[in-house]
Amino acid sequence: MRFKFSLIALSLEVVMIVSFALFVEYETSQNGSQKSASQQNASQQNAAAQQNASQQGNASSPAKEDQFFQLYPLFQHVHVMIFVGFGFLMTFLKKYGFSGVGFNLFLAALGLQWGTIVQGLLHSHGLKFPFRIKNMINADFSTATVLISFGAVLGKTSPIQMIIMTILEIAVFAGNEHLVTEIFKASDTGASMTIHAFGAYFGLAVAGVLYRSGLKHGHPNEESVYHSDLFAMIGTLFLWMFWPSFNSAIAQPENNQYRAIVNTYMSLAACVITAYALSSLVERRGRLDMVHIQNATLAGGVAVGTCADMEIPLYFAMTIGSIAGIISVLGYKFLSPLLAHKLMIHDTCGVHNLHGLPGVFGGLASIVAISWGKSTVSTMAMQATALGSSIGSAIVGGLVTGLILKLPVWNQPPDEYCFDDSVSWKVPKYRELDNYFFQHVTHNHVEHEV
C-alpha cells in the first residue's frame, strides 16, 4: 500500500490545486482589478445607488462580505460536526480507533475540496465561480454523505478504496442534489433525503457488493471496550449540540432559519427520551445499550431536517423526533441482524438505523407537512420525487461504486485483518496494564501501581 496510496493521494491533491486555479476565485472586491471596465462601472453605479438609499433612511441589503461573517459561526458548527462529531463517533471499535478518527479527517479534507469543485461547477453559469461561505457549507455537506457511507463499510476497506469511494460518491451526490433542488424544486433544508438517506443507502449498496461471507458470524475485533464507547459518546455529544446549526445553515435568514433551529432543538430533545426508553425496553434486563444511546439519540435531528424550516408546530417536530428515536432503536435491535444474515448487507455502524430510516421518515414527514399547507415552496409530488431520486441514485451509484471497489487492485484487507488499525497505522505495543485498568469483573477500586 505504501507507494500506491501515497501516489494516488498526492496526484489527487495536484488535481485539486489545478482545479481551484482554473475554476475558483475570491468573492470579495479583490477581484475588482480583473473585471472589465463595464463591470466596474456597473459596480460603481450599484454602490452609488445603495449609498443614496441609505442616506434616504432605507434599509439596504447587507453586503456579501457581511453575509460571509454572519454565516461563518454556523459553518464552524457544521465543520466541528464533520471533523469531531463524525470522527469520534467512528471510534467505538476496540482496535479501529486510529482509523475511525484518522481516516475521517483524511476523507473529509479530500471531500470538501472535491465537493467545492463539483458543486460549484454544477451551480455556476460560467467556467469560474466565486468562493462563498455557502460553497464552504455545501462542501461540508457533500463530505457528510461520504462519512455516512464510510460507516457502513468501516473496518472492511483499504485507504485506497476509501479514496475511490469519496471521489465517486460526491460526484453522484452533487448530481442528485442539483436534480432535487434545481429541477424538482423540492424543499430539503436539513437534507434528510439528499444527505442522510442518500449517504446511508449508498453505503449499504457498497457494503452489499463487498459482502464478506467470512464475517457472517462476526469478528473478534468487531466489538467495543469501555473506553472506545466513551470516545464514541464524545462524538455523539458534539453532533447533538450542533445539529440545529446543520439543519439551519442554508435556510433562508430570519423566520426560516429561526424555525429550523427551534424545530431541530425540540426534535432532538424528544428523540433522546424515546431512545432511552426503547433501549431499556428491548433489553432483557432493562439495561441501556451504549450503541443505541450513541446513535439513536441523534435520529431526531436527521428526521426533522427536511421540514425543519417549514411552518410546522413545535409538537409536530417533537413527534417526528420521538418516532425517529423509536425507529432507530428498533432498527439496531432487529433490522441490522436481519440485513446481515438474510440480505447479506453488513452495516458496521448501523447507518441504516441512524441515517437511512430516519432520513426516509423525514422525507415522508415533509410530505405530510406540505399536505397540511405548512409550506408553499414545494408540493407533495416534488417531495416524493426527491425522496425517490435520492434513494434510487444512491443505490445505483453505490452498486456501481461497489463493483469498482471489488477489483483486486485496491488492496482490500483480508478477513483476518478487518477492524484492525495495525494494517494501516503504527500502533503502540500491547500492555497487560491496558486491560487491567478497564476490568469490570469486580467493583474493587484499582490501585495505582507505578
Curated annotation (Swiss-Prot):
For side Extracellular, which residue ranges?
Answer: 26-72, 119-134, 181-189, 251-260, 308-311, 371-384
Compartmental location: Membrane
Q: Known catalysed reaction(s)?
A: methylamine(out) = methylamine(in); NH4(+)(in) = NH4(+)(out); CO2(out) = CO2(in)
What does the UniProt PTM comment say about this protein? Glycosylated.
Which residues are noted as glycosylation sites?
31, 41, 52, 58
One GO cellular component term:
ankyrin-1 complex
A GO molecular-function term, please?
carbon dioxide transmembrane transporter activity
Record topological domains on the Cytoplasmic side: 1-4, 94-97, 156-159, 211-229, 282-289, 333-349, 406-450
> What keywords does the record list, in alphabetical order?
Ammonia transport, Glycoprotein, Membrane, Transmembrane, Transmembrane helix, Transport
Q: Which residues form a coiled coil?
A: none
Membrane-spanning regions, if any? Answer: 5-25, 73-93, 98-118, 135-155, 160-180, 190-210, 230-250, 261-281, 290-307, 312-332, 350-370, 385-405
Q: How does it sit in the membrane?
A: Multi-pass membrane protein
Reported function: Component of the ankyrin-1 complex, a multiprotein complex involved in the stability and shape of the erythrocyte membrane. Heterotrimer with RHCE (RHAG)2(RHCE), that transports ammonium and its related derivative methylammonium, in both neutral and ionic forms, across the erythrocyte membrane. The transport of NH4(+) is electrogenic and masks the NH3 transport. Also, may act as a CO2 channel. Moreover in erythrocyte, regulates RHD membrane expression and is associated with rhesus blood group antigen expression.
Q: Which family does it belong to?
A: Belongs to the ammonium transporter (TC 2.A.49) family. Rh subfamily.
Q: How does it assemble?
A: Homodimer. Heterotrimer; a RHCE monomer interacts with a RHAG homodimer. Component of the ankyrin-1 complex in the erythrocyte, composed of ANK1, RHCE, RHAG, SLC4A1, EPB42, GYPA, GYPB and AQP1. Interacts with GYPB (via the N-terminal); this interaction bridges the (RHAG)2(RHCE) heterotrimer with the SLC4A1 Band 3 I dimer complexed with GYPA.
Q: Which PANTHER family match?
A: AMMONIUM TRANSPORTER, AMMONIUM TRANSPORTER RH TYPE A
Name by which UniProt lists this protein: Ammonium transporter Rh type A
Q: Provide the species name.
A: Rattus norvegicus
Which gene specifies this protein's sequence?
A: Rhag
